[in-house]
Amino acid sequence: MTLLQIDFPSHGPWGEELTKMASALAHHLNNTPGMVWKIWTENSRSGDCGGVYLFTDESSANDFLKEHLPRLDSMGIKDVRAKVLDVNESLSHITRAPIAAPVAKTA
């Protein structure tokens, strides 16, 4: 399992407004090969937005990143920080991490 962390500075939208704006993208991301899930993150107080993604393998995470960074750039999103990290599954199971979920599928 591989974790991808992405964050970037943002002036919004936040909350429900972001949900309305990004809903189509969220549904599109469900078709991402190897993606198990994505947690959407935002902090209007600090002006940060992004997500945490779980992938079945590092290759899938890197392939997604190659596709997603240009998409973010086309949306005017700059200064994107991204990290690809291995998941320690043994320790993560002890702390109840949701890493045994099936790969995301479109409804």
PLM feature spans:
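Short S/T/G/P-rich N-terminal loop/turn motif that feeds into the first structured element of a domain
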Residues: 1-48, 58-66, 78-107
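Short arginine-rich
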Residues: 71-76
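A short, exposed loop/beta-hairpin motif centered on an aromatic-Gly-Thr core
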Residues: 50-54
